[in-house]
Amino acid sequence: SGFNIDSLTVSATNDPAVSRITVTITSDEKALSQLILQTERLEVTRQVFVLDHENSLERELLLLKVAADVHNRSELREIASIYKAKIIDLSPDSMVLELTGRPEKVDAFLKILADYKILEQCRTGVTALERGGMHQHMQKPPQEVRAAQLPLPGTRCPQ
């Protein structure tokens, strides 16, 4: 059986030579193992590790443009306030809300707003870090990590 990716986020890290890819899937152990094996086979992969959901900080960003007029604007402001969403743009006929939080919070916010006319919606996908000190994957000396790095196919390393 395969797996479906729920979220995929790519970002820079504190090391300019390394990008971080965060993949979120809902799966069983077999599908998770399949994803790990397939990712480790990629030539450009340095390390693959699984974050424990309970011991991780996960965040997602939502930008939501909703139809807003004099009749529903105060309701929308109240809902935004309850969820600690920011109003980042306001026009005579719409409002743009920004919400950051765990994916479950974003889902709940969207469910509450389901009866309103959503004009546009954009979610970033999940980014995550493990709680506490340095995660075991970050404890290798930088020179050891860099020595393991290979150039992308069709490219060459600068001399």
Residue ranges and their predicted role:
Residues S1-R20, T24-Q159:
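Long, contiguous binding/interaction regions
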